């Protein structure tokens, strides 16, 4: 029997659909209690505050505080980095050394720096000064060995992310520098897996056997841009992400994430979601601006049987004072919804130019749903429709 189409799943689906039916009324009731809906010039990174204001949400949220770091500071130049050269080893050496000494800041100074995968470590703030540009390699070898990641809501071992962390705490990526992904004529792009993730999993049911490393004819899965995984107390603040091969900022299985004052510019590159919250809890997203080739602010919790096996919801998420420019959806739930999306509060935002405003999408084989999803004071100037429910999307592309 297919476990994804039995009666318990139907009950979950019905609950989700009922929540969607009452959703416009929830919007109306909340909106009547507020004075104004923000204009575009009243949201986004230019208005980010120094202090993080208390979070007021219609559900319990912890106090959202930045991680605190020791005064120790290393420049990547001190560990051998030279402009226009590959500096992966120098950056990683600085991060590892600062973490080993109890934490502090690793500084990337102004200049163009070429790198492969960077792995953040506990108690380290990787800080890009204004004028600093990290240009990421498009070669597979620069992202090996493979690491655990989620690709479209399914666990695999592949390239992970351009900036990655696994099972770390008190980590940060900050500053006013830029991170720039490789172009789509690179080796990684040319060797990406050509079948849907469902087909791949059918061929590789054991998670430990899902190794996509590009060797001996194997494909790779496109790396995420920034993806802390199994981490606690994460801060991403101030940086700009450009181009991207795939989803941009994707915390996976994390607890306690703050994303603020971030700019994503990946319009024109398909499947480049802006911020995807993936089976992660206690999240604050504020003062961000996303211009994407896919959905902008997106909530996910795993896909199909694999998502049900992991069974980690995305919950307790607040999005405020943010701007969504071009993209498929301003704020989106799905399409990976297996472990549920709970307690989402989006308020005081502007969606300007997206194809839809608030979007729910999944398909029946993917499981789960959402509950207690609240949206208010959102200004929408859209290229399409305000509210979009797509429960029967295409297998590969929804």
For the regions a language model picked out, list residue spans one by one.
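Extracellular "leader-to-stem" segments immediately downstream of a signal peptide or signal-anchor
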Residues: 2-4, 10-20, 24-107, 112-125, ...
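Beta-rich accessory regions
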Residues: 42, 95-96, 347, 364-398
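A short, flexible beta-alpha/helix-coil linker loop
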Residues: 80-82, 303-305, 394-395
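Short, T/G/N/S-enriched strand-turn elements that build extracellular solenoid repeat scaffolds
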Residues: 95-99, 114-123, 238, 247-253, ...
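Glycine-rich beta-solenoid repeat tracts in large extracellular/virion proteins
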Residues: 117-120, 133, 137-138, 161-166, ...
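Right-handed parallel beta-helix
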Residues: 130-131, 169-178, 232-242, 255-266, ...
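A short local loop/turn or secondary-structure capping micro-motif enriched for an aromatic residue
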Residues: 135-136, 142-145, 181-182, 188-190, ...
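A short, hydrophobic/aromatic-rich structural module that often spans a beta strand
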Residues: 180-204, 245, 250-255, 337-356, ...
């Amino acid at each position: 029997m297919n476990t994804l189409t039995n009666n318990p799943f139907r009950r979950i689906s019905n609950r989700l659909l009922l929540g969607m039916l009452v959703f416009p009324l929830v919007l109306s009731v909340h909106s009547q209690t507020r004075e104004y809906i923000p204009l575009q010039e009243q949201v986004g990174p230019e208005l980010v505050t120094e202090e993080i204001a208390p979070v007021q949400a219609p559900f319990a949220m912890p106090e959202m505080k930045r991680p605190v770091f020791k005064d120790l500071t290393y420049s990547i130049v001190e560990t051998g980095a030279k402009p226009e050269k590959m500096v992966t080893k120098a950056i990683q050496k600085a991060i590892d050394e600062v973490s080993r000494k109890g934490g502090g800041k690793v500084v990337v100074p102004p200049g163009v720096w070429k790198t492969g995968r960077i792995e953040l470590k506990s108690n380290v703030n990787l800080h890009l000064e204004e004028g600093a540009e990290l240009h990421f390699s498009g070669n597979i070898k620069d992202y090996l060995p493979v690491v655990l990641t989620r690709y479209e809501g399914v666990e695999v071992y592949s390239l992970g992310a351009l900036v990655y962390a696994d099972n770390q705490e008190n980590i940060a990526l900050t500053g006013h520098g830029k991170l720039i992904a490789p172009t789509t004529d690179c080796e990684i792009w040319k060797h990406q897996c050509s079948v849907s993730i469902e087909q791949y999993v059918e061929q590789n049911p054991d998670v430990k056997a899902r190794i996509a490393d590009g060797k001996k004819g194997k494909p790779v899965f496109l790396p995420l841009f920034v993806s802390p995984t199994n981490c606690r107390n994460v801060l991403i603040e101030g940086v700009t992400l450009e181009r991207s091969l795939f989803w941009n900022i994707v915390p996976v299985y994390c607890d306690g994430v703050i994303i603020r004052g971030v700019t994503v510019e990946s319009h024109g590159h398909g499947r480049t979601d802006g911020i995807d919250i993936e089976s992660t809890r206690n999240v604050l997203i504020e003062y961000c601006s996303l211009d994407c080739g896919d959905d902008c602010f997106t909530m996910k919790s795993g896909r199909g049987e694999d998502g049900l096996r992991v069974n980690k919801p995305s919950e307790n998420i607040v999005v405020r004072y943010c701007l969504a420019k071009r993209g498929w959806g301003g704020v989106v739930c799905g399409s990976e919804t297996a472990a549920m999306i709970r307690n989402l509060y989006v308020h005081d935002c502007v969606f300007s130019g997206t194809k839809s405003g608030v979007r729910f999408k999944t398909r029946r084989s993917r499981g789960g749903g959402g509950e207690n999803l609240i949206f208010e004071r959102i200004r929408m100037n859209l290229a399409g429709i305000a509210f979009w429910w797509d429960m029967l999307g295409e297998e590969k592309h929804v």
